[in-house]
Amino acid sequence: MQQMRDLLERLLAAGLPVTPEISDAMLAVDIQHFTDHDLIPFLHDRPVVFLETPAGGVKTISAPHMVVTLLHHLELQPGQEVLLLGAKGGYIAALISHIVGPGGRVTVVDPSREVVEHVRQRLKE
């Protein structure tokens, strides 16, 4: 948790729009739940792998600065319904769900069967 706080402070110091809502969501949703890979890259503002496909493809969760920028520009409000195209391991959907709250809804669409199965499994846990 402290590592995420430190990351958010660095992003804010760099001028990124880390709002209280975004900060709360990123502190509440544990990214480790969405990947079995090392989090060191993510904590250093790099993408982190969440899935390697049988064909050799690598799927990643976006770097934190991209996640913060996306969430900021979505202008999310409690109770909103959100359609997310591209699952990114389920992490961004979980962040959005945290921000829109129990009165909101998040629907995720992804063209990759492997990604969809990964997200289903991770969101069940």
Kindly give the residue locations of the regions a language model identified.
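Class I SAM-dependent transferase core
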Residues: 1-99, 114-122
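Conserved SAM-binding motif I beta-strand of class I
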Residues: 105-110
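Conserved SAM-binding strand-loop segment of SAM-dependent methyltransferases
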Residues: 125
